[in-house]
Amino acid sequence: MAVPKRRMSRSNTRSRRSQWKAQAPDLVGVTVGGATHRVPRRLVKAVKLGLVDPAGK
């Protein structure tokens, strides 16, 4: 495991961590019951099987 040679300041640590950004999931169109919904790709199978409500309610 990599170990730093010296202590990193709090401001450097926080500025390094702030570079990470969350990304919006890519949405895919799925037709369920005659209605088309846009859901994340990882939930397509669950929506088709009826395990997840595509309306999100």
Curated annotation (Swiss-Prot):
Gene Ontology MF annotations: structural constituent of ribosome
Keyword flag Ribonucleoprotein: yes
Region (Disordered): 1-22
Annotated keywords: Ribonucleoprotein, Ribosomal protein
InterPro entries: Ribosomal_bL32, Ribosomal_zn-bd
Gene Ontology CC: one annotated term: large ribosomal subunit
Any single GO BP term: translation
Basic residues bias: start-end ranges: 1-19
Keyword Transferase: no
Family membership noted in the UniProt record: Belongs to the bacterial ribosomal protein bL32 family.
Listed name of the protein: Large ribosomal subunit protein bL32
Organism expressing this protein natively: Rhodococcus jostii (strain RHA1)
Lineage: Bacteria, Bacillati, Actinomycetota, Actinomycetes, Mycobacteriales
